[in-house]
Amino acid sequence: METYGLEKLGLVNAGAVYRNLTPAQLVEHALRRGEGTLSNTGALMVKTGKYTGRSANDKFIVDTPAVHDDIAWGKVNRPIEKAKFDAIRAKVLAYLQGRDVFIFDGFAGADPKYTKAFRIVNELASQNLFIHQLLRRPTAEQLKDFHEDYTIIAAPNFKCIPEIDGTRSEAAILVDYEAREVVICGTQYAGEIKKSVFSVMNYVLPKQGVFPMHCSANIGKDGDSAVFFGLSGTGKTTLSADPQRMLIGDDEHGWADDSVFNFEGGCYAKCINLSPEGEPEIYNAIRFGALVENVVMDPDTREFDFDDDTLAVNSRVGYPVEYIPNAELSGMSPSVPKTVIFLTADAYGVLPPISKLDKNQAMYYFVSGFTSKVAGTEIGVTEPVPTFSTCFGEPFLPLDPSVYAAMLAEKVEKAGAKVYLVNTGWNGTGKRMKLGYTRAMVTAALTGAIEKSEFVTDPTFGVQVPTSIEGVPAELLIPANTWEDKAAYEASCKKLAQSFAENFKKYTHMSPEVAAAGPKV
């Protein structure tokens, strides 16, 4: 029986070994094995158990002399000894003996100059379906002569024993950059596999002069590209899905000398409160070949209830980018971005809905990675909680933040790109900015129409704020104008400015010019 070189990994005596099956074959296997259920749209639905999101505290990086000085060690990048990694890896390989395994050999990185080959070894057919749809799929020719650069082994039903294995829980995501391997066990949340690929790209690409980004990207009719950075829930997917523009991708990209390229060949979208009116592209992508995680489904009609968060608030669907009508299937733009947009949702109501940043401000707000979470009313907390995630992607960045910030500045300067901070959050009226207005502002930035406006300097944040944009009421553009109580406005400005300053203290490698570009406290 063909083993496709698994013995090189040390995986011997596996059951049946399947390689690069089609989505239809993988769905058949998953159903036969009881891994999931078929919905009325044809999508496969699985429940991932207690892990319905990334388990950030269970991720470890193997600390070896070859990588030690590269990694920004801390609460995100926790070290684990090589001996402990090897011991867990050996147990996982022993666990897989006698079990069927599913291999997907594919690629990350649409630009052939920077493509990395990944071998994913899955215990579950449903997870293999997911990664088949999320990564870039090889042609038959490429598969014949495939040599992986990195290997990821995912065995969700293998549980670690923290006292013996030195992990924090039964789940572990273990990255060995030197050995070019990742081992994932104890968690069935498929996003762990996708984000492990991303973490590898974030480690290797800067060494090749490519800036890796946690962003969405699209292209206009003239070939002009734009990138949208932002944390979860700020509008990356929604705002980059524009009928006037082609979608390059929704989550992970590289900025090279002459293009922006998608790392992936698929999308991983949130499903909560999904509707055909609100997000038709995503809604219509939930069909045969898509993998849905943790959405409540009627056992008889097999219809999804996207509003029910009983299984998870972070319910998701993975599907190939081909399922989106205006996707740019090459996964590349013909040129570098002319527009960079940082999305934030400010619950204090004091950041302008759109503002222009200079080079130092761009680095400051990029490194800060600000948004805010509004606490749930069930615990009676009404105060917004400022959230900072370095470079809009802290959990996935192995190198020091200053590396990524310097790359952003260099790429923006070289491309002559304009950088805008867009607040999709609240203003002084207590209402969230209407999506239609935000779209009009983003369009003005993408077309350059915004440059025709007069700009004023925000007194607290120092950013340049336009005084007029077509289709947006002028009073909404200046935050102070939306507040009746000016003293409350000043107090909120001060509070947010202090949060920024406090958070920025940890970035000791940033230049004094960048540190001075933040809000005035």
Name what the model sees in each region:
Residues 1-144:
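N-terminal accessory targeting/assembly segments
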Residues 68-73, 176-181, 385-391:
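Gly-rich Lys/Arg/Thr-decorated short loops/hinges at beta-loop-alpha junctions or inter-strand turns
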Residues 236:
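Conserved lysine of the Walker
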Residues 476, 481-521:
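Generic C-terminus detector
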Residues 239:
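Hydrophobic positions on the alpha1 helix immediately C-terminal to the Walker A/P-loop
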